[in-house]
Each structure stands twice: as structure tokens, then as C-alpha cells.
Amino acid sequence: MEIKGYPYDKIRQFSKRDIAYQISTQVFADFIQYKPEIDSFEHAIADRKKFPVDRALLHSVITDAYAEAGLADHQKRNLQALLSDNCYTVITAHQPSLLTGPLYFIYKIFSAINLAERLNKKFPDQHIVPIFVIGGEDHDFEEINHLRLFNKKIEWLHKHDDEPVGRLSVSGIAEVLTQVKEILGEKSKAYELVQSWEKLAAGSTSYSEFTFQLVNELFKSYGVLVVAMDKKPFKNKFQHIIQQEILLSASKAIVEKTQSAIEQKSFKAQTYIREINFFYFHEGKRKRIELEGDIYKIVDTDRAFSTEEMKLEIENHPEISGFWEFSALHSYENGIDANSMNTFTRVMPAK
């Protein structure tokens, strides 16, 4: 196989900021903890060793998620390793694009696999596990409901009214798969793969579950563990962060300060920050939370909470909260975002 390199600054799909980061990382020195270099991981791992994590919780939730799908041998080893103090994870995440959607979806997962393999070789005393997180709480249905195959657009038709996409039913997915088979033709090797996806769709109770099963089938032999974060045990563990954000608007000042510093370097801000960057699940839909005086109102509903009532709601029902579409809470994450050595990369212990 012949592999040719291509200069980052010649790839038009990259933004000005992305190109600058690759070519002149020092420009962003004030915003990153570690340089995107393989040697940086020695420091990252040392730092993460000091961080308290709930390994048992992660192991338990993932074990439950795979109860029906089952685990490949490589996945079993990785899942068991999560309980060990010398295990760390490389995480990448993406919204649940239709049948993986853009090729970038696949690239991100392979980048996590590749990085995990490199780190396992460089640090043989550590166990590095690749993880893919499904961003199923996103509500931007138009962003995930289509794909292009051989220059033909295939669209998933499904009634959508501000529900988190991961919680949608799989109604209409069978029709999507039929269209894919018609384009591929029966003689295509991919035809059998799509037939297996039909079985996955038929046995799935939600779109998130279908995406979980599909990604797992594609990458289980590489040891990738697929995680859907829209789980009550995860949110229960996360409720102190939810309280800080909703009751104290904790992220706003931090993000605004960082955005201002980035703009001073002639780069655009990446997100719009609100006073409250969580939404509330109400009757299957996600609704914004707004503070009016000393009352927390759920937009477009008749629900409202005092400060004490909201605190109790979070404590008793953390699963009713969710991230805004572009979470501003990365400053508080206990996790890692490691898409590849070609993008911002960190390492974390399993949690």
C-alpha cells in the first residue's frame, strides 16, 4: 500500500483555526493542557492517576448495555481492564448520524483505535481502551437524518418535534435500508452487511440502541466499547455538575473569558453560551431552562421551580436533565476527548 501525505494547509475542508492549530500549536498554548504529541501522554497519564474515578460504575453500565449484544473477546478484555487502576481510555464521540453518515464518523473511531494501539505499545504497563460515545441527546434531527451514497441522498423520514434523537423510535429505518440495498445491488459485498443492519433495526427499541448495535457490529473486533451517556446512573454521578450549571451558571464566565481570548487571536468563538446550558426533558421533548427572577421556568411548558425545588428535582431525577446541543461544560468534564493525534488530544482514566 502506498501512503502519501498531504499538507494540512492545502485541505480546504479544515477551518482557519484547525490549520493554525496543526501548524502553529504554540498559538494555542494558553488553551491546551498537553501538546498534541505522543510524548505528552506520559504527563497526561501521570496527571490522570491523581484523579478520583468511579470505575465500578462505568464497568457496570457498559456491562448492562452489552447484555444482549454480547462482547467480542477483545471487548471483554477491555471491559475487565476498566476496573484496573492502570487502565485509561481514549474517547471519541459523535452524534448518531444515519448509518454513520459522513465518513468523518468512521475516521474518528479509527483514530481512537489507532491512538489506543500506539499508546499500548509505548506504555506496556498501562492498558489503553478506545471508547466511542453516542451523542444521542442532540435534537438536531436534520443533521443526522440523511446520508449520501454514490452521490445519492437517502433521507430518514420520521416525525420529530424537539425530541432527543437518540430517544426516537426506529420507524422509517427499514425504508432507509431498502433504499441502500437498491443502490448497492445484490452482488455487492456490502449488501449482506446492510441485511444484518435490518435485523439490528428490527430488534431495537430506540434509534440510540440501533446506532449502538450498528457501531458495535462494525468495530467490536477492534475492542471498541460503545457508550450511550443518556443513562440515569451516569447522570446521577454527574448531578453535582448539573447543580453547579443550573443553579450557579458556573460555566458562563469561564467560557466567555476563553472565547474572548480566542477572539483576540483572530479566531471565531465556537459556541453561544447561555446562563443555563442544560435543558429539561418534558413529555419526551427537550426544553430550555430559563431563570426569571428567582424562578426556574421550563420554556414552552407550565412547569416552574423555586431554587430549592430545582435542587431537589436534580437530586431525585438527574435523568431529566441533558446537555445543550453544544455543551459548554468541557471545563468541568471528568472525561477525555481524544479524536486523534491530529486533533486536540487528552487522556483520562476510565470513569
Positions of PLM-derived features:
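N-terminal targeting/trafficking signals and adjacent low-complexity tails
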Residues: 1-351
